[in-house]
Amino acid sequence: MSLTSSSSVRVEWIAAVTIAAGTAAIGYLAYKRFYVKDHRNKAMINLHIQKDNPKIVHAFDMEDLGDKAVYCRCWRSKKFPFCDGAHTKHNEETGDNVGPLIIKKKET
């Protein structure tokens, strides 16, 4: 085997390894971007309400509701858990379409 053919094989080997490494890097970055999900939601919904609780739950007796009750679902209301219309500004800023939860007695 001459020096020229050995050198040629080495150049081909380096080129093949470079292409394989580049392809592997692009594949890894694509995998991380599209398939690996971060378990923490980067756009938190609840920004300031009862942050010391692991889960926020509000329960109401049906008898206490009266004829109609309107509850916040965007977590932006100053009267939380009741809706004050803050979702309108939230929807304009984010392009979201969230609205309140409205509970009313059935007409008999």
Curated annotation (Swiss-Prot):
The modification N6-acetyllysine is found at residues 55, 68, 104. The modification N-acetylserine is found at residue 2. Binds 1 [2Fe-2S] cluster per subunit. The [2Fe-2S] cluster is redox-active and pH labile and is significantly less stable at pH 4.5 as compared with pH 7.0. Its main location: mitochondrion. Its cofactor is [2Fe-2S] cluster; pyridoxal 5'-phosphate. Keywords: 2Fe-2S, Acetylation, Iron, Iron-sulfur, Isopeptide bond, Membrane, Metal-binding, Mitochondrion, Mitochondrion outer membrane, Schiff base, Signal-anchor, Transferase, Transmembrane, Transmembrane helix, Ubl conjugation. There is a cross-link at residues 42, 55, 68, 78-79, 89, 104-106 (Glycyl lysine isopeptide (Lys-Gly) (interchain with G-Cter in ubiquitin)). Residues 32-108 are cytoplasmic. It catalyses: L-cysteine + 2-oxoglutarate = 2-oxo-3-sulfanylpropanoate + L-glutamate. It is a single-pass type III membrane protein. It is an enzyme of class 2 (transferase). InterPro entries: CISD1/2, FeS-contain_CDGSH-typ, FeS-contain_mitoNEET_N, MitoNEET_CISD. [2Fe-2S] cluster binds at residues 72, 74, 83, 87. The chain crosses the membrane at residues 14-31. Induction: Expression is down-regulated by glibenclamide and 5-[(4-carboxyphenyl)methylene]-2-thioxo-3-(3-trifluoromethyl)phenyl-4-thiazolidinone (CFTR(inh)172), and up-regulated by cAMP/isoproterenol/IBMX, components that inhibit and stimulate chloride transport activity respectively. SMART domains: ZnF_CDGSH (SM00704). It is found in: Mitochondrion outer membrane. Its EC number is 2.6.1.3. GO terms for cellular component: mitochondrial outer membrane; mitochondrion. Changing residue 87 to Q: Abolishes absorption in the 300-500 nm range. Belongs to the CISD protein family. Homodimer. This is CDGSH iron-sulfur domain-containing protein 1. It comes from Homo sapiens (Human). The lineage of its organism: Eukaryota, Metazoa, Chordata, Craniata, Vertebrata.
